[in-house]
């Protein structure tokens, strides 16, 4: 870890490997995440895993390496654990990339093929063992919707905060044992990479995430609210039909010429979280005026998948969900979705903004 003020390598997109570390070495503010999530075909079970290289929690005495594991069951019970590895290895080979986060008592790994079509996550800990495998139903993408490789695309989604999606949407197979209980199912999966020059608390006021698998359609949306640009929205969406990209946009302003989309939170459903934002679902509209194409998707939460509380009613709630939709005037499809709604507090006793324009 660099403690000097000298510049470090910091990836900004282009042809950089999506899976490789995005900063070398770590410094005092920049952090990154490899994130995997999934929802079962009955929309009742879910998981989310996070692999981190991030100094922003070192003040808690836990170091710069972290792995988080969360699962949800149909009866509303949830399991969560966080481990702090002593070692981290990223191996880049011709076949793909392997990541290892380990200590004497546990081991977490992921493997992503070079074409980013397949992924496998494995873990061996005192409480959790098993494997999650994914087969992509989409294509790796940048925030601007272009698919990898794209030399002129940037990974910067908003000021000082970056994302790419190696696997926007996938079919997932889960075969795990948690506290001696089998946790095995098939469903929706996905993977994204998130990194920033500063902490999430510095860069973001909020975030909305949607991942959909319905019939031939695979959809991924991330929308960020900037803290540095005080409330400005930075949305990004991509839709795939039988694995081929058919729509992408960062524009939410209605137009007679340019492709655009809208996402609206709904509050008339039955399943919500414990935070101030009682969202129960989403409505999505994707419009391509030039091609005279229009898709709609209606999402209704089925179960609370995970939740983290940041104080004063803020934090993040993730849900497994049902979805119904497709192209207007054509066959409509039922499927499954994962959503997340995140709001950061305006102030925190633990974290201070790391960015200043002065």
UniProtKB/Swiss-Prot annotation:
Signal peptide stretch: none
Cross-referenced SUPFAM superfamilies, in alphabetical order?
Answer: AttH-like
State any single GO MF term.
Answer: isomerase activity
Task: Give its E.C. classification number.
Answer: 5.5.1.-
Output the Pfam families linked to this UniProt entry: DA_C (PF22903), DA_N (PF24137)
**In which pathway does this enzyme or protein participate?**
Mycotoxin biosynthesis
Q: Which superkingdom?
A: Eukaryota
Q: Does the keyword Signal apply?
A: no
Task: Give the record's keywords alphabetically.
Answer: Isomerase, Virulence
Q: What does this gene product do?
A: Diels-Alderase; part of the gene cluster that mediates the biosynthesis of the mycotoxins phomacins, leucine-derived cytochalasans with potent actin polymerization-inhibitory activities and monocot-specific antigerminative activities. The first step in the pathway is catalyzed by the hybrid PKS-NRPS phmA, assisted by the enoyl reductase phmE, that are responsible for fusion of the leucine precursor and the polyketide backbone to produce a 2-pyrrolidone intermediate.
State the family named in the UniProt similarity comment for this chain.
Answer: Belongs to the Diels-Alderase family.
Name of this protein: Diels-Alderase phmD
Q: From which organism does this entry originate? A: Phaeosphaeria nodorum (strain SN15 / ATCC MYA-4574 / FGSC 10173) (Glume blotch fungus)
Q: What is the lineage of its organism?
A: Eukaryota, Fungi, Dikarya, Ascomycota, Pezizomycotina
């Amino acid at each position: 870890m660099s403690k000097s003020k000298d510049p470090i390598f910091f990836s900004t997109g282009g042809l950089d490997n999506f899976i490789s570390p995005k900063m070398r070495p770590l410094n005092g503010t920049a952090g990154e995440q490899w994130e995997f999530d999934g929802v079962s075909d009955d929309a009742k079970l879910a998981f989310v895993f996070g692999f981190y290289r991030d100094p922003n929690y070192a003040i808690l005495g836990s170091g710069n390496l972290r792995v988080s594991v969360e699962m949800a069951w149909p009866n509303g019970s949830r399991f969560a654990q966080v481990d702090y590895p002593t070692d981290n290895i990223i191996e880049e080979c011709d076949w793909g990339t392997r990541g290892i986060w380990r200590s004497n008592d546990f081991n977490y790994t992921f493997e992503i093929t070079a074409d980013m079509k397949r992924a496998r996550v494995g873990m061996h800990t005192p409480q959790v063992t098993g494997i999650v495998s994914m087969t992509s139903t989409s294509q790796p993408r940048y925030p601007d919707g272009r698919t990898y490789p794209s030399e002129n695309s940037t990974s910067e989604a908003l000021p000082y905060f970056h994302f790419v999606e190696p696997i926007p949407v996938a079919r997932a197979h889960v075969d795990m044992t948690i506290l001696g209980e089998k946790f095995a199912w098939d469903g929706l999966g996905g993977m994204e990479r998130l990194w920033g020059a500063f902490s999430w608390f510095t860069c973001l006021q909020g975030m909305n995430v949607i991942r959909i698998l319905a019939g031939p359609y695979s959809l991924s949306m991330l929308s960020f609210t900037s803290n540095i640009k005080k409330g400005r929205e930075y949305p990004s969406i991509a839709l795939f039909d039988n694995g081929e990209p058919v729509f992408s946009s960062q524009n939410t302003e209605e137009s007679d010429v340019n492709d655009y989309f809208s996402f609206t939170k709904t509050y008339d459903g039955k399943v919500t979280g414990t935070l101030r934002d009682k969202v129960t679902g989403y409505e999505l509209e994707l419009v391509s005026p030039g091609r005279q194409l229009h898709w709609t998707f209606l999402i209704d939460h089925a179960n609370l998948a995970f939740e983290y509380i940041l104080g004063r009613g803020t934090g993040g709630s993730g849900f497994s969900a049902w979805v119904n939709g497709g192209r207007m005037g054509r066959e409509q499809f039922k499927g499954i979705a994962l959503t997340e709604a995140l709001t950061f507090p305006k102030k925190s006793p633990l974290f201070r903004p790391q960015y200043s324009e002065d």
